[in-house]
Amino acid sequence: EIMPSLVGSEMCIRDRYKVNYSLSGASIPPDAKTFSVAYFPNNAPMVAPILSSTLTDALRDKFTRQTRLTQVDEGGDFAFEGEITGYTSTTASVSGSSETALLNRLTITVNVRFTNAVDESMSWKKTFSAFEDFDSSKLLNEIEGELIPQIVDKLVTDIFQASAANW
């Protein structure tokens, strides 16, 4: 006799409280319906021609593929804007004996402003940075077409997690 009442109680509790499950790590509030991503201009001192469009498109694609939100041109319930502020190549490691660079590091830094129209307290402004190391025998312009998408993927994952995984 106890068992039916426990099952009934569980059903009442389950029906009363809605829980969002997601394989992507996103937990978007039910009231959020749309998202918008403004073009991210490259304001870094050193500019890579493909970077702005690669970053902007990757962020749009991430939200399209991994959420139920519909993309709009501007004013989405989740709205992203910002700019690329850093694109730098530095020495990552050197040979101890000859002081020769073994690896170089390409680092991309992005300022992002996220507006959550459903819950303003969840809005934020943050700086994200990611990098990839590459063999110092290669010139940056030879390898950046391969490195930029890898770094952008890291940045987009971090931005996505910061905005959609906090619920």
Enumerate the language-model features and the residues they cover.
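A structural "domain/chain start" motif
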Residues: 14-57, 61, 68, 73, ...
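Surface-exposed short loop/turn segments
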Residues: 23, 64-70, 77-123, 132-146, ...
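A short, polar/charged loop/turn motif at coil->beta-strand junctions and beta-hairpin connectors
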Residues: 7, 29-31, 76, 122
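Short coil/turn segments at secondary-structure junctions
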Residues: 4, 42-46, 138-146
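Compositionally biased, intrinsically disordered linkers/stalks adjacent to structured regions
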Residues: 144-167
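Short hydrophobic alpha-helix segments
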Residues: 126-128
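Single conserved hydrophobic/aromatic residue that forms the stacking wall/gate
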Residues: 1-13
